[in-house]
């Protein structure tokens, strides 16, 4: 049996390939994955050991070939400097867990519409309203992360990853 470096054993791209290998024998080796994705074998190795961040196009290829839509969110929210500021990290969760998170998030924004109207009624954001606005933003960002989880859940169950 081949030894796996500790950094590789927890790498999201490697784990996605190994999950894909359960259904596609070619994914058991980097050589086979390279042929399936079009990403060079040595480059895949460096991506999987964590010494190289893949290009977005490579992540798209791997997500499609491995049927792992969660790689898209992972890359954008954790590897891309712009995405780290703008894309909420999402988990690959089951429907029951997503539902509970969604209902909790809805409960947390229950009266935010009234609060937002109160803040916006004069058309200005005063310094004392900034903390309230940040609280509203945090609640909405929580919903955005849950929306990403729902998208991952749907894409994972689709026969083929659909383009939005």
Positions of the model-derived regions?
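Short alpha-helical DNA-recognition segment
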Residues: 21-46
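DNA major-groove recognition helix of helix-turn-helix/homeodomain DNA-binding modules
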Residues: 57-75
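Mid-protein regulatory/catalytic core that forms ligand/cofactor-binding pockets
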Residues: 117-164
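Generic structural signal for well-ordered, non-transmembrane alpha-helical segments
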Residues: 60, 100-110, 134-148
């Amino acid at each position: 049996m081949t030894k796996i470096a500790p950094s590789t054993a927890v790498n999201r791209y490697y784990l996605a390939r190994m999950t894909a290998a359960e259904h596609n024998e070619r994914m058991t080796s980097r050589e086979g994955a390279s042929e399936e994705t079009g990403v060079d074998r040595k480059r895949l190795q460096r991506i999987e050991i964590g010494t190289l961040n893949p290009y977005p196009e490579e992540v798209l290829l791997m997500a499609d070939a491995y049927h792992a839509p969660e790689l898209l969110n992972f890359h954008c929210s954790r590897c891309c400097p712009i995405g780290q500021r703008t894309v909420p990290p999402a988990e690959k969760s089951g429907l029951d867990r997503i539902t509970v998170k969604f209902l909790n998030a809805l409960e947390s924004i229950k009266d935010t519409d009234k609060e937002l109207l109160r803040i916006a009624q004069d058309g200005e954001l005063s310094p004392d309203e900034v903390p309230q606005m940040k609280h509203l933003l945090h609640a909405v960002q929580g919903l955005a992360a849950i929306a990403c989880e729902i998208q991952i859940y749907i894409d994972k169950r689709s026969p083929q990853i659909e383009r939005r």
